[in-house]
């Protein structure tokens, strides 16, 4: 990643901070001198600390970068064209939070598999009413369980994120030099060839808005994004609703036939088609334009095989025990 890309990332973080004010309590420290002398044994850190007083804002480096030919821009334009085509193909789903899509896929995946296996197993007992009653009982309890699991998982992610932010804020107030070291380590991990002047210039630019130093470390050092508002509730409803919706599919055919064997056949036919298209569409949503037709077909077949094995095993063992 180039320094231009890194500065673009900082601009994004600035816009985010202005919009959300997520760590605005650090704003009052904007004039605090963050680049101080280092007592570290690391020669790299010593060089950065000693050169910080000589480098104002890396004007020469910035001018060189601005005057250099920007081949990245052309690549970005090509990437934008590909992105536009992908957006046109995905339609509505492109505007939905990827985490919501992920939760929906989790709910649908389990909902299409578990209730199908259960209803297939219960059908071996020969009682359609038992299949419907047992299927609905499992469907409701499963949706609640999946929803609670999604809620707790999202809550744990949110708690971890805010704990990391709090820790970095405390580190900033206790010893802001540690923040500079972390930013330096992140930059060197991105590109070990960054010069001392480039790193110091970047830190000096970033220190103008101190709360962004915390945001930068959290996002690029910890790999964490701020959870969306009401993330826990959205995750619970999406996963639980997806499970409920998916679980209704194998159950519906039993409402329209009197013979449980016929209902099982119809349910299998419906589920083969549904599982295949679910695997196909899931791959298209998750991989976008990077997924080939053969890959999507393969994923669809795999979903059919997994669902079929689960349903077949349930039917066999219930029949064996019955």
Swiss-Prot record:
Q: What keyword terms does UniProt attach to this protein?
A: Golgi apparatus, Membrane, Phosphoprotein, Transmembrane, Transmembrane helix, Transport, Vacuole
Give the protein's function.
Has a role in both calcium and manganese homeostasis. Involved in the transfer of iron and Mn(2+) from the cytosol to the vacuole for storage of these metals.
Which chemical reaction does it catalyze?
Answer: Fe(2+)(in) = Fe(2+)(out)
What does its record list under induction?
Answer: Down-regulated under iron starvation by TIS11. Transcriptionally up-regulated by YAP5 in response to increased cytosolic iron.
Primary location class: Golgi
Residue ranges of the TM segments: 100-120, 130-150, 237-257, 260-280, 301-321
Q: Where is the composition biased (Low complexity)?
A: 26-53
- Modified positions (Phosphoserine) are 29, 53, 68, 71, 83
Q: Name one GO cellular component term.
A: Golgi apparatus
What is noted besides the main data? Present with 2840 molecules/cell in log phase SD medium.
Q: Where is this region: Disordered?
A: 19-86
Q: What is this protein called?
A: Protein CCC1
* Effects seen without this gene: Deletion causes an increase in metal sensitivity at 15 mM manganese, but does not affect invertase glycosylation. Deletion shows increased sensitivity to external iron, which is suppressed by MRS3 or MRS4 overexpression requiring oxygen but not respiration, and exacerbated by ectopic expression of the iron transporter FET4. Deletion also results in decreased vacuolar iron content and decreased iron stores, which affect cytosolic iron levels and cell growth.
Q: Which compartments is it annotated to reside in?
A: Golgi apparatus membrane; Vacuole membrane
Which residue stretches are annotated as topological domain Cytoplasmic? 1-99, 151-236, 281-300
Q: What's the superkingdom here?
A: Eukaryota
The UniProt entry lists membrane topology as: Multi-pass membrane protein
- Give a yes or no for keyword Membrane in this entry: yes
Q: Which family does it belong to?
A: Belongs to the CCC1 family.
A GO molecular function for this record?
A: iron ion transmembrane transporter activity
Instruction: Spell out the disulfide connections.
Output: none
């Amino acid at each position: 990643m180039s320094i231009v890309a890194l500065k673009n990332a900082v601009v994004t973080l600035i816009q985010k901070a202005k919009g959300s004010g997520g760590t605005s309590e650090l704003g009052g420290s904007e004039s605090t001198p963050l680049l101080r002398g280092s007592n570290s044994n690391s020669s790299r850190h010593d060089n950065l600390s000693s050169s910080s007083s000589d480098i104002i804002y890396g004007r020469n480096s910035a001018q060189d970068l601005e005057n250099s030919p920007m081949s990245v821009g052309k690549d970005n334009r090509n990437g934008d064209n590909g992105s536009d085509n992908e957006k046109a193909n995905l339609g509505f789903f492109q505007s939905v939070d990827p985490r919501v899509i992920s939760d929906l896929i989790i709910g649908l995946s389990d909902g299409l598999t578990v209730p199908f296996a259960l209803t297939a197993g219960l059908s071996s007992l020969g009682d359609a009413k038992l299949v419907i009653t047992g299927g609905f009982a499992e469907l409701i309890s499963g949706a609640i369980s999946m929803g609670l699991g999604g809620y707790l998982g999202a809550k744990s992610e949110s708690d971890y994120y805010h704990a990391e932010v709090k820790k970095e804020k405390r580190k900033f107030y206790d010893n802001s030099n540690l923040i500079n070291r972390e930013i330096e380590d992140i930059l060197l991990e991105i590109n070990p060839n960054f010069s001392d002047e480039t790193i110091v210039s970047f830190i000096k630019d970033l220190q103008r808005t101190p709360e962004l130093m915390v945001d930068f470390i959290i996002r690029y050092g910890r790999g964490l994004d701020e959870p969306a508002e009401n993330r826990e509730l959205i995750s619970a409803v999406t996963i639980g609703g997806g499970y409920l919706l998916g679980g209704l599919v194998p159950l519906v055919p039993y409402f329209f036939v009197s013979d449980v064997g016929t209902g099982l056949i119809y349910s299998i036919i419906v589920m083969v088609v549904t599982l295949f298209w679910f695997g196909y569409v899931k791959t298209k949503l998750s991989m976008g334009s990077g997924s080939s037709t053969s890959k999507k077909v393969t994923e669809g077949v795999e979903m059919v095989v997994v669902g079929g094995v689960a349903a077949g095993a349930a039917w066999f063992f219930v029949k064996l025990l019955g």
